[in-house]
Amino acid sequence: MNRWNAFLCLNFFLPLPEASVHPLAWNLASALAFVLLGLEFRGRLAEQSLRSLPALPVTPAFSHSTLPLVLIWCVQLWVVVQWAITSLSPYDSLMSLSQGLLYAAVFTLALLLVDSRQRVRQLVWVVVAAAAFQALYGAFMVLTGLEYGFFAEKEHYRGVATGTYVNRNSLAGLMELSLALGIGLLLAEPTRYFGSARQRLRQLIEVMLSKKLILRLLLAIMVIALVLTRSRMGNTAFFASLMVAGALALVLMRNKTTATTVLLGSLLVIDIAIVGTFFGVDKVAERLQQTSSQTESRDEVTRDTFNIFLDNPITGTGAGTFTHTFPALKSSEVTSFGLYNNAHNDYAQFASEFGAPATIALAVVVFWAFWNGIVAMRQRNSRFYQGVGFSVTMAIVAIGIHSTVDFNLQIPANASLFVVILALSAVARWAPHNSTSGRMRRRTGRKASA
């Protein structure tokens, strides 16, 4: 198995063992990512030596990503400092460091390995396949009443879709990110109908027999699973991000076709009106209507988490320490008897654990990626990379909304996929228009020299 296929397998299997929330799972994933990263750099050093190149051969996406690479790796160095000196729970900070190294390695690998349209397609299909499996599994458990997670009977969230995840909101986060990639791929490869009625009919039949129909069906299944999670903010974030990214696409994209507008409109109408009607979007709406300050304590948890940040604005309490620091520092208004493993607000939790400088550094990486997505939609002449830019924009908006009330970025499988999408923003903006993979280019070069 080559490095690229191993990277695809890593992205496929991360969601399976309960979203890799257990230390064994994320430590193994981190070790694999570092092995792949080491092998990738060794291969590029060998290529540099073989071809007598003045510098290490890297992709355009990697060469334009110096700032985010420096920031994301410096944050890991900061966690090392926290673990050694300032953390209120050094063991938890060490575990968080292992997760952070996984994300940094995956981000770097994506910039180095995703160097062609073919590889972008393969990566998107792998992510969609992994999410579709989770969607089918979760929907099957709900509709049959079997209620099993990852080789164990579910203790919580019975009657709603969780897939092999523990938390329904985390599964909703996976659906949001994967749907963004899938919809972007549909936009990246639009169907064009032209010619006589007979030719148009032939083109329609070809579409019905192509991978596009399979992709559209998988996306519909994922929307069904999203609705079946009954996640209020998950569903809200998905549809809001689709509308925001869709509006930006219609305004920014050059040479828009009627098919683009029809596709975006059909996604909203079909998914809400048809899929939602049959699979219970009304129950999600009912949960939204029943939400009040009396039924939710997340607002108080977020407020107390922010107060913890104000007590440690620079150094933070230490990465990964929320579970052990919050019970001792929460106010008396938080009366829940359950243990809060996370703050239910990624912004507040990152700030309280990492401190302001590191949190700002991570925010810069996200805004850098968001800007790349916008620029790709506006300036690229390639419809394919415009579609990738759409995916990045939609995914960031979705997670940005959902993170106000949940903790998707504390879930290793979701956070890893998110950093892959951040890396794809550089691919969308800077990848050559008709790029082929580095492996294919090297083969072509050897044949030419022979």
Which residues are covered by each model-predicted region?
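Membrane-interface segments at transmembrane-helix junctions in multi-pass inner-membrane proteins
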Residues: 148-187, 233, 346-350
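Helix-loop-helix junctions and helix-breaking kinks within/between transmembrane helices
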Residues: 18-28, 166-169, 209-246, 281, ...
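Hydrophobic alpha-helical transmembrane segments
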Residues: 76, 80-83, 119-150, 166, ...
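Membrane helix-loop boundary segments at the extracytoplasmic
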Residues: 12-20, 167, 349-354, 387-420, ...
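Hydrophobic transmembrane alpha-helices and their immediate junctions
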Residues: 356-390
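A membrane-periplasm/extracellular boundary helix in multi-pass inner-membrane enzymes
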Residues: 136-146, 189, 193, 220-230, ...
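Transmembrane signal-anchor hairpin modules in multi-pass inner-membrane enzymes, especially those
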Residues: 1-95, 101-129, 185-216, 243-266, ...
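TM-adjacent membrane-interface loops and short helices in multi-pass inner/ER membrane proteins
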Residues: 167, 299-341, 347-350, 354-361
